[in-house]
Amino acid sequence: MTKPVWSCNEWDPLKEIIIGTSIGANIPQNDLSHHATNYANLTPEEYNAMPKGHYPLEVYEQAEEDLEGLVSILEQADVTVHRPDTSVIDFTTSVSNGKWITDQYEAYCPRDSITVIGDTIIEGAMSLRARYHETFLFNKIFQEKMMAGSKWFPMPKPMLNDSLYRIQPGKDPSITEEEPILDPANIIRMGYDILYLISNTGNEKGAKWLQNTLGDSFKVHMMHDLYSWAHVDSTIMPLRPGLVVLNESRVPKNKIPKVFDNWDIIWYSDDMCVGQKAHMDYAPASSWIGMNVLSIDPQTCIVPQEETHLMSAMEKHGITPVPVQMRHMRTLAGGPHCVSCDLVREGKLEQY
């Protein structure tokens, strides 16, 4: 019998998934959490001068068209697709917890805010204030899954006070250990092992909360001094047992996680990266977003259509790449993996 949610890794056969939306996407007005999380490399003057507010209409139109193309690919592979309930939040309004106020952000990247580990839905405690209410868009889906028997654990809502943040333009994260913070896009699921990136969007207290919540069935491995910005899925992407894509500019050979000992590695290098276009200055995602791929099963992977070198490397390892158009990956900060959250994958909990 299929469980209402079940996903233990990034590659088992995919059966059910959430795909995000660009509707209402917005760049928050000047806000400390936005500066520290996404733009810590900018001076306050540079950050304040950035364009803010809504995107041009064509960005939304093209992004939604591309997401529909992704949905079509998934449905042709017999994957059930859910979409966010965009009636829940008016993205033109502000968000506040009483101590601060800022604009809404977007729900383009469900992977950033939610994940499934085994038979459990996890809602993150995100570092970006503008995303404070974002998971409300998935509540209807989660309530249905809960009523069908799944576990559903939201993290404690963070205060996100000014004292949480420090503008760190170098290698160190721009959040402190004041309270548990975790964007679920900071983790890679590897069966019993959970790789956890310490960065601007996930701290050690967040890792401790996750370990305590999951219990002894899983082991959370904190990765320090690897990549201090946001999220892990343009740095490390396992494709199947024994094969992983690693970002050559971010993962030194002496920092490769031990779980990948004896695995084959596709090094996503400067030569391989095609340099995804940004349609705005100060795009929140780098050109490395091109390795943000989504596996349908261990032999099939959805890849941004420009990434021809990566697709060729996959084919040499027996993986069939499925190209998808995603014109605003850098602008809206999400490739096929980011804009999705798998709810059900076949397979069992294993040690890799």
Predicted features along the sequence, with ranges:
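The feature marks the mature, well-folded catalytic cores of soluble enzymes
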Residues: 1-352
